[in-house]
Every structure is written in structure tokens, then in C-alpha cells.
């Protein structure tokens, strides 16, 4: 039987999905399963790693049954995952010693404060490209080793294993034969030197993490090991591609050349720009990260995150009840010519890149007696585009690369008003693909390259299909006037604390 399909596993923050992708890069079938969020204390977020594994087994079975595709027809498996979420488990039994600590969780704030106090910020920045923040995996591992009796000693003896979710899934799928991660996930740990491409002894010592528990770091596209047959309907299928979710989306968007960038409009926004084989150190509060490693070389990216994007539209729907469903926002915003000087700064949980101001809160400026909900809704949508310009401007400053086009995906990229305004406020075209499942496609393409479904990146590029290209319609003078108003609004919001 011909092996012509790739199974892509997308392990996200609230659900796990499995998709089958054919040789044309089309999604043939999908299965999805949600799992529980655990909130032990305010600001803490955890997952049961065994429940995540059970959800993965369920969606693998579900998608094969739904599509009536045999496991014999699967050429390889690609994995993309919620990044930074951390699991530590017993090497012999395979049982986690504590819940997985999720990327959003703030429970390691005290460890981060101590690292800052001890003066490690420059060391971490210069070796990992990251900031000291509870977001990243290293402090989560330290927290588990501190809070589970005997864990540190067991880790030092080599009895415990550490991994981000990709590592956990590969270990389970292969029956413990492969304890590995890829470059993109390793670069999110605070423990990996992105220049020397190795676990860094100074960083490990800083957090007192035993090297014996760390996975081997491998390319993002390579056959790592085969699945154990009893997990896969009797078949041994190669696990052949891994990338963290945002890097997978960059790959799935075909952003293979230096200077190409994508923005994922989800709950927040994640912007990544490919900077090629050279890591760009940010002077503007952006993260320097590994994009992927393929064919014996690695490529780097600059990353900026916006905390509130799609969640601002949910706020219009659920909090203010201005729209019945999120998609109605496009209709309201398009009814009027402009926001009439209204600016919404959606800093509900502070502002991310390039401001990194966790104390600022949301604000609305420019209201008059004539302001109606259309202006309010439009200004809220526009705030997503302004924040995107803030980050992209910082990327251009850092990299010296001028953006030619922005590729977009994620839920809010379906909003035509927002995409047109995004193009206008950036002054560059915005391209939306037909297939918005770019994260899953990225994982599938990485696996498919390793097992020969696709020959090279040029062949993959052909499977990126344009849905709509939004050309710049706004004059430069108007663009800069609007953007200057946004900056005034942000400064005013920052002054009110």
C-alpha cells in the first residue's frame, strides 16, 4: 500500500488535534479532543500530562477511522506543540512526577525575581535570546524539582527526564526509545545556547538542572524513531518532524527566505520574521529564537508577541455585548469611514513587545457625544493592526530588513476589514492563505521532507495557495497621522497607573 499521507499532531493549550495531510498539502481529515485546565492557585496553570497523552491517542484513532485511511498509508508523523509547557517524568515507569506546568503559568515568578537579583539577565539574553520570565521552560523545571520530594536527587542520578510537550509525546509514541527535542523547542527553555547549539553548562548551573535529564536536540526534520506498533494499529510509523507552534506556522506559511514574516492572530498575536542563518540580537525587547534546523543548518527568527488580539474582539462580544458574534465586528467597522479619533488601547494584561509594560491597563481615548458603537468596534479592531506595526517596526530596526509582505493566519485573519487596515497601516501588502491551518501544515511539511513525500522547500512553496491579497490603499500622510495618534494613546495609557 502506497504511503502517501502525513499525520500531523497539533498539541495545543486547550485541545489536541490530529490531521491527515495529502501530497498536495490539503487537509483530508481532522479529529479534536479537549482536556482539562488545572488552576491550583490564581495565576497558576497546569495540565495532566497523561491526559494530554490520552487525548493524542484518541485523536490519532479518531482521524484514521473518520477518513478510513489505513495506518499503513501514513508515511510519517509531524508534531507541533504549545511551547514552553514543561513535563518531568520517571524514566522507568513513564509517569510524570507532577502536572505539566503550562506556558501561561506565573508560578515561577519568585525564581525569576531571584535570577534578576543575581544579575543573570545579560547572560541569559546573550546566550538564549530570551528574557527572564516565568513563560520559559527552565524555571518551570526548577520549580518541579524544588516542590517534589527527592526530585533533585533522583534527577542527578538520571532517574528523571525533562521535556517540553514535543519531547513527552515522542517519548510516549516511541515507547521510550527516543528522548529528543528539536532546535525550535530547545530554544525556548532558557537552558539552550542558540549560538553554540548546545545545552549551556553555565545556564544549567544557574538553575541547578542536571544535564542527565535533558533530551538530545535534533533537527526539526529528520526520522527520530518509529512508533511502537500497539499505539498505531500495529504499524511502526516514523516520527519525522517537530517544531514549536509559532515556528511551525512560519514554516507552514512558506516564510523560507530572510525577511519574510507571518502574524498569527489568535487570542494574542505572534509575529515571527525569518532572519536567515544569522541570529539578530534585539535592542527593542523582541526575542531571538531558533526557527528550525534542516539539512545540517539552522535558521533564526525574531519574535514579538502581542498579549491581546482576538480576545479584544471576544471582549466586545462577551464583556460589552456590542456584537452577537465576533465576525459581526467586520460589518460594524465597515459601516463608517473612520473611527473619528477614537483609540482603544487593549492593555487588559499589560502590553507585550516592544513596550513590555506589565502595569499599564486598557484605556479608550477620543470619545465624544457623537461616538457610537461602530467607532468603538472599529477602534478596537484597529488596535490589533497598530500593535502589529509596533512589533514589525521593532523587527525592521533590529534586523535592518524592510518587510515586503506580511503573511497572516489565525482566527481574526478572516476579518477583511482588519486585514485591509493592517495593510494600510503597515504600508505593505498582506497575504492570507487558502489553508489557514498553517501550524499543522508546518509540522506536516517538516515530517514530509524527512520521509520523501516532498523533495525540498521549493516543492513545498507550491502548496502555499493565496486566498486574498490586501493591497495598500491609504495615503502615507493619513497612515502616519493615524499611527502618531496611536502612540499618543499608548503614552497616555502608560501615564495612568
Curated annotation (Swiss-Prot):
One of its GO terms (cellular component) is cytosol. CDD domains: FGGY_EcGK_like. ADP binds at residues 13, 17, 267, 310, 411, 415. PROSITE patterns: FGGY_KINASES_2 (PS00445). InterPro entries: ATPase_NBD (IPR043129), Carb_kinase_FGGY (IPR000577), Carb_kinase_FGGY_CS (IPR018483), FGGY_C (IPR018485), FGGY_N (IPR018484), Glycerol_kin (IPR005999). Keywords: ATP-binding, Glycerol metabolism, Kinase, Nucleotide-binding, Phosphoprotein, Transferase. It catalyses: glycerol + ATP = sn-glycerol 3-phosphate + ADP + H(+). Pathway: Polyol metabolism; glycerol degradation via glycerol kinase pathway; sn-glycerol 3-phosphate from glycerol: step 1/1. It comes from the Bacteria. Sn-glycerol 3-phosphate binds at residues 13, 83-84, 135, 245. ATP binds at residues 13-15, 267, 310, 314, 411. The modification Phosphohistidine is found at residue 231. GO terms for biological process: glycerol catabolic process; glycerol metabolic process; glycerol-3-phosphate metabolic process. The phosphoenolpyruvate-dependent sugar phosphotransferase system (PTS), including enzyme I, and histidine-containing protein (HPr) are required for the phosphorylation, which leads to the activation of the enzyme. Belongs to the FGGY kinase family. Homotetramer and homodimer (in equilibrium). Key enzyme in the regulation of glycerol uptake and metabolism. Catalyzes the phosphorylation of glycerol to yield sn-glycerol 3-phosphate. This is Glycerol kinase. It comes from Listeria monocytogenes serovar 1/2a (strain ATCC BAA-679 / EGD-e).
Amino acid at each position: 500500500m502506497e504511503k502517501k499521507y502525513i499525520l500531523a499532531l497539533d498539541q495545543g493549550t486547550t485541545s489536541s488535534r490530529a490531521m491527515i495531510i495529502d501530497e498536495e498539502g490539503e487537509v483530508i481529515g481532522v479529529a479534536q479532543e479537549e482536556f482539562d485546565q488545572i488552576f491550583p492557585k490564581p495565576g497558576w496553570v497546569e495540565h495532566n500530562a497523561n491526559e494530554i497523552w490520552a487525548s493524542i491517542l484518541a485523536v490519532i484513532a479518531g482521524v484514521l477511522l473518520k477518513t478510513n485511511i489505513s495506518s499503513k498509508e501514513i508515511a510519517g508523523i509531524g508534531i507541533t506543540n504549545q511551547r514552553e509547557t514543561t513535563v518531568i517524568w520517571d524514566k522507568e515507569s513513564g509517569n510524570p512526577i507532577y502536572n505539566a506546568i503550562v506556558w501561561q503559568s506565573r508560578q515561577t515568578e519568585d525564581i525569576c525575581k531571584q535570577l534578576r537579583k543575581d544579575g543573570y539577565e545579560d547572560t541569559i539574553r546573550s546566550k538564549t535570546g530570551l528574557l527572564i520570565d516565568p513563560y520559559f521552560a527552565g524555571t518551570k523545571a526548577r520549580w518541579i524539582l524544588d516542590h517534589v520530594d527527592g526530585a533533585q536527587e533522583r534527577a542527578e542520578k538520571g532517574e528523571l527526564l525533562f521535556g517540553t510537550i514535543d519531547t513527552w509525546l515522542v517519548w510516549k509514541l516511541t515507547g521510550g526509545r527516543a528522548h529528543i527535542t528539536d532546535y525550535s523547542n530547545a530554544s525556548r527553555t532558557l537552558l539552550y545556547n542558540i549560538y553554540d547549539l548546545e545545552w549551556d553548562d553555565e545556564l544549567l548551573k544557574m538553575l541547578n538542572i542536571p544535564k542527565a535529564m535533558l533530551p538530545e536536540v535534533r533537527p526539526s526534520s529528520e526520522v527520530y524513531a518509529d512508533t511502537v506498533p500497539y499505539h498505531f494499529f500495529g504499524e511502526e510509523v516514523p516520527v519525522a518532524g517537530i517544531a514549536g507552534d509559532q515556528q511551525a506556522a512560519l514554516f507552514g506559511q512558506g516564510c523560507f527566505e530572510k525577511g519574510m514574516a507571518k502574524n498569527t492572530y489568535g487570542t494574542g498575536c505572534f509575529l515571527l520574521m525569518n532572519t536567515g542563518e544569522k541570529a539578530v540580537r534585539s535592542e527593542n525587547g523582541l526575542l531571538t529564537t531558533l526557527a528550525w534546523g534542516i539539512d545540517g543548518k539552522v535558521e533564526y527568527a525574531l519574535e514579538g508577541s502581542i498579549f491581546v488580539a482576538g480576545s479584544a474582539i471576544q471582549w466586545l462580544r462577551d464583556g460589552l455585548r456590542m456584537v452577537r458574534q465576533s465576525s459581526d465586528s467586520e460589518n460594524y467597522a465597515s459601516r463608517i469611514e473612520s473611527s473619528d479619533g477614537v483609540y482603544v488601547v487593549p492593555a487588559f494584561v499589560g502590553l507585550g513587545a516592544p513596550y513590555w509594560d506589565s502595569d499599564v491597563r486598557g484605556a479608550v481615548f477620543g470619545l465624544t457625544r457623537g461616538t457610537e458603537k461602530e467607532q468603538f468596534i472599529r477602534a478596537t479592531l484597529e488596535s490589533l493592526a497598530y500593535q502589529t506595526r509596533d512589533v514589525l517596526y521593532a523587527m525592521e530596526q533590529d534586523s535592518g530588513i524592510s518587510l515586503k509582505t506580511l503573511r497572516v493566519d489565525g482566527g481574526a485573519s478572516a476579518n477583511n476589514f482588519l486585514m485591509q487596515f493592517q495593510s494600510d497601516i503597515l504600508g505593505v501588502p498582506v497575504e492570507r492563505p487558502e489553508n489557514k491551518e498553517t501550524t499543522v501544515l508546518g509540522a506536516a511539511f517538516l515530517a514530509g521532507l524527512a520521509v520523501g513525500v516532498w523533495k525540498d522547500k521549493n516543492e513545498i512553496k507550491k502548496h502555499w495557495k493565496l486566498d486574498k491579497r490586501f493591497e495598500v490603499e491609504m495615503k502615507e500622510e493619513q497612515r502616519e497621522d493615524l499611527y502618531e495618534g496611536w502612540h499618543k494613546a499608548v503614552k497616555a495609557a502608560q501615564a495612568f497607573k
